From Swiss-Prot:
Organism from which the protein derives: Homo sapiens (Human)
UniProt entry tagged with the keyword Transmembrane: yes
Taxonomy, superkingdom: Eukaryota
Extracellular side: 36-46, 105-123, 145-173, 223-247
Gene symbol of the encoding locus: TLCD1
Cytoplasmic side: 68-83, 195-201
Name assigned to this protein: TLC domain-containing protein 1
Membrane topology (UniProt): Multi-pass membrane protein
Cellular component aspect of the GO annotation: plasma membrane
Record-annotated membrane-spanning stretches: 47-67, 84-104, 174-194, 202-222
Amino acid sequence: MPRLLHPALPLLLGATLTFRALRRALCRLPLPVHVRADPLRTWRWHNLLVSFAHSIVSGIWALLCVWQTPDMLVEIETAWSLSGYLLVCFSAGYFIHDTVDIVASGQTRASWEYLVHHVMAMGAFFSGIFWSSFVGGGVLTLLVEVSNIFLTIRMMMKISNAQDHLLYRVNKYVNLVMYFLFRLAPQAYLTHFFLRYVNQRTLGTFLLGILLMLDVMIIIYFSRLLRSDFCPEHVPKKQHKDKFLTE
């Protein structure tokens, strides 16, 4: 009798429901004064809390996977470990949850960049989940979550109007370093690796297309980060006021 369900589907469902339950639990926490008075900021705050939790867990998990299976740094297509596979399923579940959360909360227009990113990320992760290829690439991609820890702290402090706090000023420099080490560097390394699939009709070619689009998004985000934190006089005060990604 043919198997009707892929064994990864329960893992994806379980991860998605875990993040849903986590969001409900985090919604019980007290809110900063500047957040609780604004429904949009309240939603952003809760959304970022879940993102923060995901970044901490998956960022540390990705580092452990690379440490346990260093072949993932070289054999990006074929290297595999159970821990790495579960990590990719875990993060795919987060992206499914966050996509549903954004759409269900009516933030699709304000958060369209996040939705595009999530769709591309899920497309890449599903190749590792359902075809057991490029699991190593998925783990290396998730090193970005180490950078996201500090990026999320930055966004949460901006939402709560704490830009003048010492922690914000320290974090903006740490965030810049982490952006280079765990976002730009891994992305450049992966792009260089996947360029070998140019002119081929393979799964690697599909993933190269996703990587190139993510490259563009990462460069745009980096320019926004520099402009907002280091050249604030060049940021129009009312520009993108309602965007989920605060600059």
